Curated annotation (Swiss-Prot):
Pfam families referenced in this protein's UniProt entry, alphabetically: YCII
Lineage: Bacteria, Pseudomonadati, Pseudomonadota, Alphaproteobacteria, Hyphomicrobiales
Family: Belongs to the YciI family.
Cited PANTHER family: BLL7171 PROTEIN (PTHR35174:SF3), BLL7171 PROTEIN-RELATED (PTHR35174)
Listed name of the protein: Uncharacterized protein R00369
Domain of life: Bacteria
UniProt cross-references to InterPro entries, sorted A to Z: Dimeric_a/b-barrel, YCII
Length: 124
């Protein structure tokens, strides 16, 4: 089954890292990724740019509004995601644990099963 592993963190913490700290964290996370790539389980991985570059489109009262940044007023923001093919939720949680152990910050990892739909096909 495919799972999305969504990476959340306080953007003010991660943006304060020095270049060296950021490179070290990325290197440690890459080591975790390699293990799952070699097992044929890891799909696309993305690191999102800061929320200051984001826009949110919201439909309200018959109007479409575009706002700068994310809509959620929260300390933790979605900073990246992984797609992983695992036999069980427990296996996907093990992957998230490995990521968490490689990342010294206080962020969180949300693991969510995926339902895939092919373009032009409706789910049954």
């Amino acid at each position: 089954m495919l799972y999305a592993v969504l990476c959340y963190n306080d953007e003010s913490v991660t943006s304060a890292w020095s270049k060296e700290e950021d490179e070290r964290v990325m290197r440690d996370l890459s080591a975790v990724q390699r293990k799952y790539v070699e097992a044929g389980k890891l799909g696309p991985v993305a690191r999102l740019v800061p929320t200051t570059a984001a826009a949110t489109l919201r439909h309200s009262a018959g109007e479409t509004i575009v706002m700068d940044g994310p809509f959620a007023e929260t300390k933790e923001q979605l900073l990246g995601f992984y797609l992983i093919d695992c036999a069980s939720l427990d296996e996907a949680l093990d992957f998230a644990r490995d990521l968490s152990n490689a990342n010294p910050s206080t962020g969180s990892y949300e693991v969510r099963p995926l339902a895939l739909y092919k373009p032009g096909e409706l789910p049954s």
